[in-house]
From Swiss-Prot:
Residues 89-392 form the Peptidase A1 domain. Secreted aspartic peptidases (SAPs) are a group of ten acidic hydrolases considered as key virulence factors. These enzymes supply the fungus with nutrient amino acids as well as are able to degrade the selected host's proteins involved in the immune defense. Moreover, acts toward human hemoglobin though limited proteolysis to generate a variety of antimicrobial hemocidins, enabling to compete with the other microorganisms of the same physiological niche using the microbicidal peptides generated from the host protein. GO terms for biological process: fungal-type cell wall organization; proteolysis. Pepstatin A binds at D107, T108, G109, E160, D161, D292, S293, G294, T295, T296. It comes from Candida albicans (strain SC5314 / ATCC MYA-2876) (Yeast). Residues 58-70 have a biased composition (Low complexity). The keyword Hydrolase applies. This is Secreted aspartic protease 8. GO terms for molecular function: aspartic-type endopeptidase activity. SUPFAM superfamilies: Acid proteases.
Amino acid sequence: MVSIITFTKNVLVTLAFALLAQGLAIPEDIDKRAEKVVSLDFTVTRKPFNATAHGQHHQSQQQQQQQQQQPAQKRGTVQTSLINEGPSYAATITVGSNKQQQTVIVDTGSSDLWVVDSAAVCQVTYPGQSPTFCKQDGTYKPSSSTTSQNLGKAFSIRYEDGSSSQGTVYKDTVGLGGASITNQQFADVTTTSVDQGILGIGFTGDESSPTYDNVPVTLKKQGIINKNAYSLYLNSASASSGTIIFGGVDNAKYTGSLTALPITSSNELRVQLSTINIAGTTVSASTTPVLDSGTTLTYFSQTIADKLAAAVGAKWNSYYQLYTSSCNLAGNIVFNFAKGVTISVPLSEFVLQDGNSCYFGVSRDSATILGDNFLRRAYAVYDLDGNTISLAQVKYTTSSSISTL
């Protein structure tokens, strides 16, 4: 594959010189398109952690789940719910013939792309919240795009954190990372309690409406990438940016070897976990967590979460719905997967500070999720065509060595 890419680059260099000699313009992104990859940078946004708001929010979530009959799509993506609890990973895309800019959460835990309508109603849920909070990261006005198609279908999605969005299904041109895909289906949301739009890139089987080609599938079908696969590099907790590469992998961003683990679900990006080493204790954790870029914290069943918390001396607080912990957790927590794959994470990644108090970044939930506090220390390649997720220990570097998948 490398030799093919090198040959292609040489041909393109020759072509570029030929075009310049004739006074013609060189097409934008000619090199990127030749390598069949789309590199999309994250913008990292941080908000102070608020334990009181977390507790009130999750208690409200539990009440809503008891009252509502509609099944949730997934556990709420904390960054896209009403309370951001850590770094939020979003990317800028454009929608429409006039390239209306949107900044959307990149979410491996859901599968739908939806954006906020220019006339949307933002559902205010707590005192002091701006009535336009959902429009601050860009909006979409269908009538201003000559390529917009209203499909006349209703869209509704609800997350387990109680947040929800409703609107109408459209097709239009979507631009991301220098690539442009035409007739992409997505939702134009007119009512939402979520902070901003979401770019869901999971399996199509997890979509909120009858199966359609979501963004990664369309990228492949329109020949922009070779396969429905992408690699995720969130970068360090203090970094201002990260990258997702559709159709490619950055071999400079990990140490050791990438090992492919079978995806254990037909509609969610889950892999087999076996044990967790923490503070000299080995905790049995035979479960299949979702590797979810749209969730800040890590979640396990109460049995597993209690054992992890006990190992670091953290105590459950029912009001905050979190474990209170020391602000100075030392050492590492090591996640042991199938095939001998291990990912080591400093326990400092699992400390949430609110004033002088600190909380453990693992909490209880019926859904098992490895969120951003895990993913920042892993380099992950999601191969949805091959039904695998490959993992390796991350390497923080500005160097890059991208190859196609």
